[in-house]
Amino acid sequence: MNLKPVLFSFVAFSFILACTHTKKISKTDSMVIEEPSIRLDTIKIVADEPIKKDIYKATNTKLSDIIHTKLWVSFDWQKSQLIGKAELQVKPYFYPTTMLYLNARGMEIKSVKLAEKQVKALPIKKGSKSVVVEDIFIEKPVTYKYENDSIKINLGKEYTSKETYYITIEYISKPNEIKEGGSGAITSDKGLYFINPTGVDEDKMPQIWTQGETQSNSAWFPTIDNPTEKMTNEIYMTVENKYTTLSNGILVDSKKNTELIRTDHWVMDLPHAPYLVMMGVGEFKKVTDEPWNGKEISYYVEKEYEQHAKAIFGKTKKMIEFYSTRLGTPYPWQKYAQIVARDYVSGAMENTTATLHGDFVCYQTTREIIDGAKGESTIAHELFHQWFGDYASCESWSNLTLNESFATYGEYLWEEFENGKDAADDHSADSRFGYFAQSAQKQVDLVRFDYEDREDMFDAFSYNKGGQIIHMLRKYVGDDAFFASLKLYLEKNKFKTAEAHDLRLAFEEITGQDLNWFFNEWYFAKGHPELEIKKTYDGTLNKLTLTINQTQDLKVSPLYKLPVYIDIYANGKKDRKQIWIEDAKNTFTFSVNYKPDLVNFDGEKQLLAKVDFAKTKQELIFQYKNAAKWGDRDEALTFFKDNSRDIEVYELLKIIAVNDPWRKFRSKAISILNEVAKEKESEIKPLLLSIYAKDVNTRVRASALKALAANYKGEDLNALYEQALNEQSYAIASEGFDAIANLNPELAMKKALALENEPSKEIIYSIMDLYSKNGTDANHEYFKKAKKQFSGFELMSFGNLYGKFLKRCTKPETVIDAAKLLTKMASGDNKYVKYTAQKVMKDNLINVWQSKEDKLNSQIEKLKKENQDVTTLTSDLKVITDTKKQIVDLYITIKK
């Protein structure tokens, strides 16, 4: 599951090393072992207060094992309900049992029956001695108790692990009647979602989709809803002929029942976890791409995006080939499909063979992709999950990082392969920043058994920090050993569950090393290293001395063992040294015949640590020019940001803006040069014009145009901004429009009319920003149309600008229409969007019109005291009061 579009961004980890698993022995157990008696002195222990036990979230105990789940489902769109029948093939996991416990949330259970398969020999024909063997099922009702979202089924006899039985349950799933939960990462846990089921919202395609992680699929089919479970499954989905369906595995049959109704039969014949089962239903258009090794690759999108589907998802086949080769493990599943859903409650979800993306993650037109494919890293993340998370799964949510850190690192691997090392390191730096931001809020272990809510595991620790740790492990063991270890881990744990120690054992088997030290400090402890580094050079003795102190709080974090490279640049050469930092205070000396130009700590820029190592301007200039890694150049640019007026830095920044191989560093240099752009107009303006004309990247060109607009005026530039409106790049066009809006709002209002039909969100934001500052009631229709382009968390940004605009509106019909739009906006499942709609309605409509009412009341009272005529004002007051009342009534409905 990818959370970045949701939050997140959405940290660090701890573990209890000495825990033992115990089995309770019941009175009915056949064996009782008596320990020898030992007489001990009596010791009286008195506690001042009760001793609190630490929370320990144990891996789920396996009592029963679902072998196969078969579902028959149809849908009542009007009621947002699923009518279902489930047939579960079950056996006791190991110990004999007379009971079966299933998770089933918010259901109406119609019946529960048990069947046993029996073999019966029947004569081929009357009087014949030849027989045919048939499997027959003897079905009978069983007693059960359904409470607390669980079905407790009495099997009527004891079954052993060698016996299989079948449970059939008829039920109605009522997801909208479930007491809804969720978290910042996954905002709802209803499991089954009917989006605009009655079609009341003409802007949103009616659809059904599911979200199983963490344990929400039991809201639409009875199961053992836990990551320890693995099963095969199939599903018969009865729908109207106009709808397309998607589920796990292969569509083996589609049977027409009537002129309007058909049943699709999907079969998943490889085992996976219940939370990975999915359904999608709607008037989706299926776009089929070139297969990979005979396996179908397909994309399910709304009609408007059918022509763009291959532009959005077209690298999927290349990704599958890359990951299959890199991991030494061919893509293991039957097909790979991706579907895009409206009002999705997270970012994306790695359902086996059928990933679901929120529309705000992936939907772009082919023209928008000119400026960059915004969903590419998410597509890579979810695909990598098909190996790490689906093929080999974490055995418990405590070990979630085995799923999410690898999917996060899958993003890095793809960026590295497809877009180069700079792109990968830049992506990694964003992830590292997300971890450090959350680590300032809390400190937890990577693998943690003491979480209060399993949803808490979906954070920047399981994702971001875990991905950084995997990268450090790769750098420590080397690429060959790293990928060989991953191959072994996947082979040993395929179609099974694993914990962090299984990963360690795979690496140890390949490398021959004991890696407990690495896993103990990174997987089973909190925090990260904080290093204070100082250097001295003795020219007489030709000795370089480095002192490196670990300054992290050792009451919270461990004393780390850190293998790291030191690159020493002297006399035109680079000399690499490996050191091991193991103590709180460490001193290293090196023989260096010349005074170093630069001592570069962590030459691979792979260490997850806060590092305090002061460098001079000359060292950082040298570092930028000679230490080529992304992290080296980024560190230098960070220093240059506050020193742009230094002549050496200034001259180098001009070179960076043109020549740095990484487009974001070129843009960053342009941004830094803004500080001196006005005082250096004769040099900077021509430079920016040249970059705008020649740079190959549209984002860099847009940065140059933005800098020109921020610093200079002139007819030549005005013409340039108007020309920019005709660029294919929306990034450039929006910067041109913003420049016109800042210089000449009246002209921008006219130019906006020609751009109002553009689907680009960058253009839409620019126009909405203009209208929020200069618009009138007449521009409200644009906001209504623009809203159709936003969904999910994007609606929060839309709401912010919409609210500012509504303060400018004066007509009752406009604000009542706006209140209705906000009511519709609040009708989805995203609680953050609901909050945004409520806040806009209260702050920008109710409070504004309350203020109008109060002001007019005061004016009327004053005029009455002066015996003035207030007939017109009283009439105006009635309009305002009635308007406010209608808004308040709508507000009350969305607050319920």
Where are these regions (language model features)?
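Hydrophobic alpha-helical and helix-loop surface patches within well-folded domains
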Residues: K23-D29, I109, A115-K117, W266, ...
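Non-catalytic accessory/interaction domains
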Residues: Q211, V239, R262, V287, ...
